[in-house]
């Protein structure tokens, strides 16, 4: 809908499905790096969004998403632990572009994310296992350098981006037989950089590709590389 000040407000919904599958290695049966088991987790999501855009290109983007979790974890000795639960995620993001050169703008961005995870208690055949997690808050400050060109009559948008992420202190707890408790702290600071391109093939069809690298800049040791490519349809 069009607002009195010329801004545009859009609302909608989306659905999603995610699947995680991996191996667990560690200090097991007296050996370091020995295979301990496998984990699988699937999530089905339903979300709502609202986006306010300014004629000059500024935006405010809000998202609420609810995810149903279903997991299957099993050890090399045949013990199993089914994981069921849900996740509530809320996000608000704002940005505003400033021209810096012909065909190029720089867009400072800020974002805050709230997330609450709830998992059902389970029994793995040896002990009762319960889960408890604090609400997690994550903040992001970043910037995107974006260009706009025309190739073969079609818009082409290359971009560079950089972000600083900080997850404020939160704790996950796993309790075995109502007595033994393992805690995991969430607090961390991470930086990432990325490059990407978007090519419009038609008013409602575009293709995109991106690559990102992220690394913790605190005492936590974590590094990751990501790549994405796809086709986007709008209607």
Where are these regions (language model features)?
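Membrane translocator/pore-forming domains, dominated by Gram-negative outer-membrane beta-barrels
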Residues: 1-235
């Amino acid at each position: 809908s069009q607002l009195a000040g010329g801004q545009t407000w859009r609302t909608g919904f989306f659905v999603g499905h995610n699947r995680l599958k991996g191996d667990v290695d560690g200090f097991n049966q007296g050996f370091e790096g020995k295979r301990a088991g496998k984990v699988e987790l699937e999530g089905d999501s339903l979300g709502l969004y609202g986006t306010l855009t300014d004629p000059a290109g500024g935006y405010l983007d809000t998202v609420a998403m609810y995810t149903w979790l279903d997991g299957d974890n099993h050890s090399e000795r045949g013990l199993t632990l089914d994981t069921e639960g849900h996740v509530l995620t809320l996000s608000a993001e704002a940005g505003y572009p400033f021209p810096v050169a012909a065909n190029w703008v720089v867009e400072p961005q800020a974002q805050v994310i709230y997330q609450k995870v709830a998992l059902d208690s389970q029994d793995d055949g040896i002990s009762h296992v319960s889960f408890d997690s604090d609400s997690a808050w994550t903040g992001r400050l970043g910037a995107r350098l974006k260009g706009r060109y025309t190739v073969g009559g079609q818009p082409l948008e290359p971009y560079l981006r950089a972000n600083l992420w900080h997850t404020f202190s939160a704790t996950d707890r796993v309790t075995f037989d109502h007595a033994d408790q393992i805690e995991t702290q969430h607090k961390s600071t991470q930086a990432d950089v990325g490059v990407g391109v978007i090519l419009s093939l038609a008013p409602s069809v575009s293709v995109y590709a991106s690559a990102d690298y992220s690394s913790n800049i605190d005492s936590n040791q974590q590094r990751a590389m990501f790549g994405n490519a796809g086709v986007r349809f709008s209607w």
